[in-house]
Design a protein with these regions (language model features):
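N-terminal beta-strand motif that seeds the catalytic metal site of vicinal oxygen chelate
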Residues: 1-18, 74-77
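Vicinal oxygen chelate
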Residues: 1-2, 46-48, 88-126
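Core segments of cupin and vicinal oxygen chelate
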Residues: 11-53
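A short, acidic/glycine-rich surface segment
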Residues: 32-34, 40-42, 56, 61-67, ...
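Short, charged/polar surface micro-motifs in flexible loops or helix N-caps
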Residues: 50-54, 61-63, 84
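Mid-chain, well-packed structural core segment of small domains
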Residues: 70-85
């Protein structure tokens, strides 16, 4: 095998305050480090959730990602949870809207989607 594991996933957000609040304060990611990159005029925030690292680049005025219709590239991030229903209730209590819960036709497991401040689809899956 060429690779041991995925080291990190990088996403781009457009609003520093909204993105950091969403991923850290609402979803519970831990900030590992945070840097302003003057040469690029953007921020890079390294986040951690369990064994997963997420690089959050904040690039003001970045073009919007096409979600509908879907474009090539990263489709979504998916988080494993013990209970989709309980997690949906918690997301709703935080003011985060979700799609209706459904059952994955191939795995038989419950799942649903919600969106980050820049409309990146995020999935929760049992």
């Amino acid at each position: 095998m060429l690779f041991d594991t995925i080291h990190h996933i990088a996403i781009i957000g457009s609003d520093y305050t909204a993105s950091k609040h969403f991923y850290v304060d609402l979803l519970g990611f831990e900030v590992i480090r945070e840097n302003y990159r003057a040469e690029r005029g953007d921020y890079k925030i390294d986040l951690k959730l369990g064994d997963c690292e997420l690089e959050l680049f904040i690039i003001p005025n970045s073009p919007s990602r096409l979600s509908f219709p879907e474009a090539c590239g990263l489709r979504h991030l998916a988080f494993r949870v013990k209970s989709v229903d309980e997690t949906v209730d918690k997301l709703h209590a935080l003011g985060i809207k979700t799609e209706p819960v459904r059952t994955d036709a191939f795995t038989g497991e419950k799942m649903t989607f919600f969106f980050d401040p820049d409309n990146l689809p995020l999935e929760i899956h049992e």
